[in-house]
Amino acid sequence: MNKLLNNSRIISGKIYMVELDQQPAKLLRVLTETPTHIIFVEEGDHGSDVFERNKQDIQGIYELKDWYEANGM
């Protein structure tokens, strides 16, 4: 599985599987990226939540297909 965060291949507006520190992996849309942070949108049935994370707090960002294939789903 290719960790996109290490390769600077993140596309704004795209949905990725994201592993954040001390949280289970979840689907998040990347809104934009700064040199130190990534701003995400978490979309749900009752609306959206926009938040930022320091890149050092992100364990990995993966293409959905790669994530599901690697985890046997």
Regions found by a protein language model. Name each.
Residues 1-9:
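Mixed-charge, Lys/Arg-rich low-complexity intrinsically disordered regions
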Residues 4, 35-37, 41, 67, ...:
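Residue-level signal for functionally critical sites in structured catalytic/ligand-binding pockets
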Residues 15, 23-51:
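Basic/aromatic-rich interaction segments and small domains that mediate binding to polyanionic partners
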Residues 44-73:
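Intrinsically disordered, low-complexity, charged/polar segments
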